[in-house]
UniProtKB/Swiss-Prot annotation:
Taxonomic placement: Eukaryota, Fungi, Dikarya, Ascomycota, Saccharomycotina
UniProt region (Disordered), positions on chain: 1-113, 128-158
Name of protein: SPS-sensor serine protease component SSY5
Assembly, per entry: Component of the plasma membrane SPS (SSY1-PTR3-SSY5) amino acid sensor complex.
Annotated segments matching region Serine protease: 459-699
Cell compartment(s), UniProt: Cell membrane
Underlying gene: SSY5
Propeptide residues according to the Swiss-Prot or TrEMBL record: 1-381
Organism in which the protein naturally occurs: Saccharomyces cerevisiae (strain ATCC 204508 / S288c)
Keyword annotations: Autocatalytic cleavage, Cell membrane, Hydrolase, Membrane, Protease, Zymogen
Amino acid sequence: MVRFFGLNKKKNEEKENTDLPADNEQNAAETSSSNVSGNEERIDPNSHDTNPENANNDDASTTFGSSIQSSSIFSRGRMTYGTGASSSMATSEMRSHSSGHSGSKNSKNLQGFKDVGKPLRAVSFLSPVKEEESQDTQNTLDVSSSTSSTLATSENARENSFTSRRSITLEYIHKSLSELEENLVDIMDDIHQDVISISKAVIEAIEYFKEFLPTTRDRIPYRISLEKSSSLRKINKIVLHFLDNLLVSDAFSNSRSILLRRFYFFLKKLNLITDDDLISESGVLPCLSVFCIGSHCNLPSMDKLGMILDELTKMDSSIISDQEGAFIAPILRGITPKSSILTIMFGLPNLQHEHYEMIKVLYSLFPDVHMYCVKDYIKKAASAVGSIPSHTAATIDTIAPTKFQFSPPYAVSENPLELPISMSLSTETSAKITGTLGGYLFPQTGSDKKFSQFASCSFAITCAHVVLSEKQDYPNVMVPSNVLQTSYKKVLTKESDRYPDGSVEKTAFLEEVQRIDQNLNWQKSNKFGQVVWGERAIVDHRLSDFAIIKVNSSFKCQNTLGNGLKSFPDPTLRFQNLHVKRKIFKMKPGMKVFKIGASTGYTSGELNSTKLVYWADGKLQSSEFVVASPTPLFASAGDSGAWILTKLEDRLGLGLVGMLHSYDGEQRQFGLFTPIGDILERLHAVTKIQWDIDPQLDG
């Protein structure tokens, strides 16, 4: 690898030493071409694009206004810029500079020669000339006599420009993409060989994007596919490498924004970003996001990437060591799903410079797969509660000012003996750890008398790390969580001390504290259930993290979200769609799912086709995971045990996909879960009984 880079560097140095004059000529030609494109876009009579980006073109030629500059004291010596009627050589210089330009530009520049006396605007690239007042009059006459012919040329140029856009061919587009790819690849090679600075490289990259299809201002009349265009995939990879790895420092924030915006208009021109996408023309900068690898993704390297990750999970953990919670996530990354490419995200809790160097080494592993590293890590989704913010304590009823309505930071059932799923849960003695009640499972004993004692029993399920502890083997469980109720009570008591004795406010706080005490005492007298089995272990390279709780017979157990829970953003989650009616064993990549956790409530996402690999508890593990969509939040601390659900397509009701056990602690956009099929299979292996989400039918 190093030798290859060294050879390239040597060739580049020889080329620079031998071809310097030619390079200078080429740069001048490119500058001239760029100026032509900018002016043609600006005067197109058939375009209705009012985008500020096009109105304020970045090309240097757009700094011309209606007034061409005059001789000024801003000049350091007798050398100054050719301007208006004050310089005789200005006209010839401008004609020479614009000889390869369209008639439109000549017309606009020549019109400026009549605006003598308007405010000065400095132009940096005009050739300096000697002040020779004696020739000004003759030059001005020459300009005036040529105005009519120039206007005719301008009209022809506009017509030719419009015709060329209409006659653009697919072959020409692919050729332009190939040229852009070659230019960007050369830039990236120079960066990796330290031939060019990142600042200069990103400027060159931006210029290349400006020169792409210069006569096409709006969208092309074709649809370019990432799956079929290797050049487009490589271009995307290079841009993402800039944005995610090379320009991460705050010093490059401006360059990063400009490149991202240019890339956005590039994708829009190729119809990879449509008007229906989330990115709008309101002036808000586009942003990179992560997306799931769905069933419709046919990118070439997807199968190979999946094989590598599968082999990685089979490696001996004794020869591997990494930071606790570090992970590798195969995803799609880009501005929109259609414009995204395969990406490997390396999450590390302690991100260092050497990790970015590792990305440079891995850059050439796949020609069209992006790689980047972020500060992130996998952690358990149980919550270690310290305190509850006081702003959630109470709200005043505007109708009756003397009444106070308190809103606890946890779900409360209307009937304490009918607890819906997704409520908060903790052990009776826990002081910090709290999670979510996933749902209810029922043993299917059949006619076997050996298990007849379990025939009418109901069992709740949650994550083992929420309810198992070394201090107690079979702890009692409380729903709602004892941890959340106790913390909420402390907040109210502390807040009540701020009001004088006998005040209406203090009385209201103390009444709510009394209500919480009554509920806690009732829960201790009417125990919800007791943990009878649980494990957190690696079984066949997969995490088995769940526990079953034998529910007291006085409680009515149904797998329903309940009517007493807080409102959902999805208006269809009503009536029959509140009930879990089916187990989903065949998970389809890209399937839309949601969960209702005790901490974050309702969040949605999509199933990823390839598993996530992570390092935890001294072992290499893998897990199915959900990518948050459309908002970049799926899970947080306190959501452990929440069921992953989906709306059924062929009938009313919900389908059970799995149970959440972990999430990425920094960005909280991934939710790791255990499929329901694996849970039921493991329960059958341990208990020798079949389990289901519906009670066993009599007889």
